[in-house]
C-alpha cells in the first residue's frame, strides 16, 4: 500500500481497487484478473463479516486470511502481492453495548486482525454506543481511534510495521448498505476532512503514537458517490473540487466507499482527484448474481425439468423463509419486495450464497451445465458480453469461466480508473 500511495503522491495517476467480499468466486475472480499483471490485489473484510467471535461468515481474522491464502494457492497467485485489509474496525458490531465494553471488544478485534497479518487497518470509532450521545464529539472519535491504533502498534512485529498502514475517518453509509432510498449525497467539506486529520493527530500524539501517524495513508470521505436499491448517484468532480484540492497539501490520499456502479470514466476521475482507494463490494456480488441467473436460464433450455437445479426457486424459498438480511431494507409490498430480492443494486442476496440449500443448488446448476455443450447462441442471449469475449478467443465457455469473467467485467472498469496506461 505504501508504494502505491507514494507513487500517487509523486504525481502518477494510480489507485487501487479494494475488493470487499468474502465470496470465494469473487476473491478468485480478483486474483485471476491480476494473476499476470504484477499488480497488488487488496482484499478487505469488514468487522461484521469477520471478527474475533466469527462474524456473520463464521470466520475469525486468521480464518479469513487462511481462506484467502487457500484460494490464492489454487489460482497460483503469489502471497507477496496480496494485501489484506480490515474495514470499519471499531465498535460497529457492539453499538448496543456500553462504550467501555464495546471498546474493550474493539481493541481485541484490532489485535486479532493485526496478529493475523492484515496490514491495512481502517480505524473507525465513529459510531455511538449505548451510553453515548449521538453524534459523537469528533475528539471522542479520535481518542477512541487512537486507542485502537495503540492496540495495533503493540501487537505488530517490527517486520509487520514495515507494511502496516492505517485509514482514518468515516463518512459512509451503515456497513452493509443504505436501508432507505437516497435523493442526494452530502459531499464532505474540506474543513471537516481537515478537522478529522487534526483531531486524530492530536489524539495519537497524546498517546505517544507519533511514529504511527506516519502509517496513516488515507482519510475516508464522501466525494458524492452512492447507490441504493434502484438509484446510483454518479461522481460530479466539480462538486468535490475543494475537497480534492485540500488533500494535495498532505502526504495522504482519500479512500472512497460505495463506489459500486460508477462509470469507468468516473473511476479515472476519482483517482485523478486523489480518491486513490476505491472500495467495491455489492457490484461484484451483483455480477455474480447476474451470472447465476443467466446460467439458470440456460439450464431451463438445456436440461430436462426433473434434472434441473431449481436454483432460482430455492433462492426465493430460502430468502422468503429467512428474511433477516433483507426485510428492513426492501419495500414491504410482496410484488415489489420480490423485485428487490432479485435485482436490488444493494444485492442483499449476497448474504444467502453460503446457505446450504442455495450452495447445493448452485453446485447442481454448474454440474448440469458442465455435462452439456453451451450453444453460442444461448450464451449470446443471456451473457452477450461474454459471447463477445468467446468470439475473440479469450474465454472458454464453461459455467465457471463465465461466472468469473462476468465478475471481472466490474474489475475491468476499476482497472481503467486505477491504471493510467489502460485504454
Curated annotation (Swiss-Prot):
Pathway: Carbohydrate metabolism; D-tagatose 6-phosphate degradation; D-glyceraldehyde 3-phosphate and glycerone phosphate from D-tagatose 6-phosphate: step 2/2. GO terms for biological process: D-tagatose 6-phosphate catabolic process; galactitol metabolic process; phosphoenolpyruvate-dependent sugar phosphotransferase system. One of its GO terms (cellular component) is plasma membrane. It holds the Pfam family GatZ_KbaZ-like. InterPro entries: Aldolase_TIM, GatZ/KbaZ-like, GatZ_KbaZ_carbometab, TagBP_ald_GatZ. It comes from the Bacteria. Component of the tagatose-1,6-bisphosphate aldolase GatYZ that is required for full activity and stability of the Y subunit. Could have a chaperone-like function for the proper and stable folding of GatY. When expressed alone, GatZ does not show any aldolase activity. Is involved in the catabolism of galactitol. Belongs to the GatZ/KbaZ family. GatZ subfamily. This is D-tagatose-1,6-bisphosphate aldolase subunit GatZ.
